[in-house]
Regions:
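Conserved G1/Walker A P-loop phosphate-binding module
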Residues: 1-82
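Conserved glycine(s) of the Walker
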Residues: 17, 156, 247
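Active-site phosphate-binding and catalytic loops of NTP-dependent enzymes
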Residues: 31-33, 100, 172-176, 199-211
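Catalytic P-loop NTPase motifs of RecA-like helicase/translocase cores
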Residues: 40, 63-65, 97-98, 125-126, ...
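Conserved C-terminal guanine-recognition region of P-loop GTPase G domains, centered on the G4
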Residues: 52, 76-144, 217-219
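Active-site glycine-centered loops adjacent to acidic/histidine catalytic or metal-binding residues
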Residues: 59, 120, 150
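Canonical P-loop GTPase G-domain recognition
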Residues: 114, 123-181
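P-loop NTP-binding site
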Residues: 185-294
């Protein structure tokens, strides 16, 4: 029996459901999900293994016009998704008319590899809207196979997965067959804490935050974690901590609960807040945090 393996890279505008889709494919919560734009900052790999296949799903940041160095690095992750894809998933949502970056859109419509256009959130539409959107995207991206789906409700996701398996090239596996992702444990600690900050703070605060896990010690029954929450300004530090530390405590409790579910162990989590001035515009800091791949 021939073995198939390949990279299935998911791209699209912010908040169209890319992370929800990858989590649905993988069956694990690898990508954090919030209603805020730019929740996904990195390119995250989720691996699905079968007896004769290995699918490497790649979740990418939503496509935006970069305003500072961090966002430019995020768009570099999207560019790399075009370079190594065996199948490209272009994800849109009901009511969406176009990708926000014309250069990326041109890459999609001139792609030499298979393109699956997934029209997401159809649970929020009626039949007439769905038919109009299907026709619109057939005209805009004639090289794509179009699937109406609801990633959140898991509608038609299996049909897309079955088609992906058919499109995979013949190849040995790229990773061990028990692998779930290419990211280390510390990455998921960082992302879990950052998700709670996105959910609990407004305006610019969540976007000025980066997390660094300083310590990750795993024993038989407990994992001890010490994490630093980086911000750019002293005023942001005060907001993160909150009155008598209440806001930071809330983030810590929520993150610990999710991490205990993820790792299946008791978690002892310590969080501290530190000012790292203008880190989003520093090439050195971005490289240190794993963004700048150049």
């Amino acid at each position: 029996m021939e073995h198939r393996a390949g990279y299935i890279n998911i791209i699209g505008n912010p908040n169209v459901g890319k992370s929800t889709l990858m989590n649905a494919f993988v069956g694990e919560r690898l990508s954090i999900i919030t209603s805020k734009a730019q929740t996904t900052r990195h390119r995250i790999l989720g691996i699905v293994n079968g007896e004769d296949f290995q699918v490497l799903f790649s979740d990418t940041p939503g496509i935006i016009k970069p305003a500072y160095e961090l966002q430019s690095s995020m768009m570099d992750f999207v560019k790399s998704a075009f370079e190594d894809a065996d199948v490209l998933i272009y994800m849109v949502e009901i009511g969406e008319k176009e990708l926000k970056d014309e250069a990326f859109f041109n890459k999609i419509i001139h792609s030499k590899i298979p393109v699956l256009l997934l029209l997401n959130k159809i649970d929020k539409s009626n039949q007439e809207q769905l038919e109009e959107q299907m026709q619109l995207w057939k005209e805009k991206v004639p090289n794509a196979e179009i699937y109406p789906i609801s990633a959140l409700e898991n509608f038609n996701v299996q049909a897309v997965f079955d088609r992906i398996i058919e499109l995979l090239p013949t190849s040995p596996p790229f990773y061990p067959k028990d692998a779930l992702t290419d990211k280390p444990e510390r990455f998921f600690v960082n992302e879990t804490i950052r998700e709670k900050i996105l959910l609990n703070y407004d305006k610019e605060i969540p976007y000025a935050v980066e997390i660094e896990t300083e310590e990750f010690k795993e024993d038989d029954n407990i994992i001890r974690i010490r994490a630093i929450i980086m911000v750019e300004r002293d005023t942001q530090k005060g907001i993160i901590i909150g009155h008598k530390g209440a806001a930071l405590k809330k983030v810590g409790i929520q993150a610990r609960e999710d991490l205990e579910k993820f790792f299946g162990k008791q978690i002892h989590l310590e969080t501290y807040v530190k000012v790292n001035k203008d880190w989003r515009s520093s090439a050195y800091q971005l490289k240190r945090f794993g963004y700048n791949q150049k």
